[in-house]
């Protein structure tokens, strides 16, 4: 604003106080058995539904913790977004439940995206949207209870933007990570046995919490 003049520009600073987040990070193999199945499960919140038998473990977790809530389910690609939404809708059909999942990404028509946005703005509606970066910011979709993130987002800024869609109106921001990986082969070499998605998710959170690191904006 002071460009071309000798006037000083003052940037206002606001004390936002302490922020509270609620983060959860679960790791699933795409096929059974799961790690730690023989141990007592730690449950932070009771399930609100039951996924059909044979459901993908990671998607079953999302299905069982979105019923009766308004949530965003973030994916990292349009193809994955389509596949996730289709699977969740199939679980509704198998359980003979009303459809409670919508989809939102850049390849859909504007009218289709707007229809999903209008549904989310309705305070009486308890649907969830499977989305890509199109719903990271900028579009008002009302009050959300939580966001799910399938695998780790590509950047710290992406993580913060997606987390920031929740936690409004005095509630803590809430994100549940769902890391999904294939079982390593019995003779797999060490790098193939490492849960890279899980490590990437932990690293993204630590980079911001411990270093306050955020990628510089692209010019």
Model-assigned labels for residue ranges:
Residues 5, 16-20, 28-31, 78-81, ...:
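Conserved nucleotide-binding/hydrolysis micro-motifs of P-loop NTPases
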Residues 76, 129-136, 143:
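Beta-edge loop/turn motif
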Residues 123-126, 148-216:
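Conserved segment of the helicase C-terminal RecA-like domain
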């Amino acid at each position: 604003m002071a460009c071309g003049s000798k006037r000083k520009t003052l940037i206002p600073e606001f004390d936002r106080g302490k922020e509270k987040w609620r983060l959860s990070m679960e790791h699933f193999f795409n096929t059974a058995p799961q790690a730690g199945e023989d141990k007592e499960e730690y449950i932070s919140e009771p399930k609100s539904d039951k996924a059909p038998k044979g459901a993908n473990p990671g998607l079953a977790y999302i299905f069982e913790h979105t019923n009766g809530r308004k949530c965003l389910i973030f994916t990292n690609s349009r193809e994955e977004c389509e596949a996730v939404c289709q699977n969740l809708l199939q679980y509704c059909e198998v359980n003979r439940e009303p459809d409670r999942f919508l989809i939102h990404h850049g390849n859909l028509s504007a009218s289709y995206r707007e229809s999903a946005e209008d549904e989310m703005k309705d305070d009486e509606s308890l649907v969830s949207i499977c989305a890509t970066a199109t719903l990271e910011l900028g579009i008002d979709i009302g009050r959300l209870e939580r966001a799910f993130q399938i695998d780790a987002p590509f950047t710290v800024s992406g993580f913060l933007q997606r987390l920031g869609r929740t936690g409004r109106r005095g509630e803590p921001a809430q994100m549940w990570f769902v890391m999904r990986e294939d079982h390593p082969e019995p003779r797999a070499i060490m790098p193939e046995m490492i849960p890279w998605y899980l490590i990437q998710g932990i690293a993204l959170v630590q980079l911001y919490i411990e270093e306050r690191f955020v990628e510089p904006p692209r010019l």
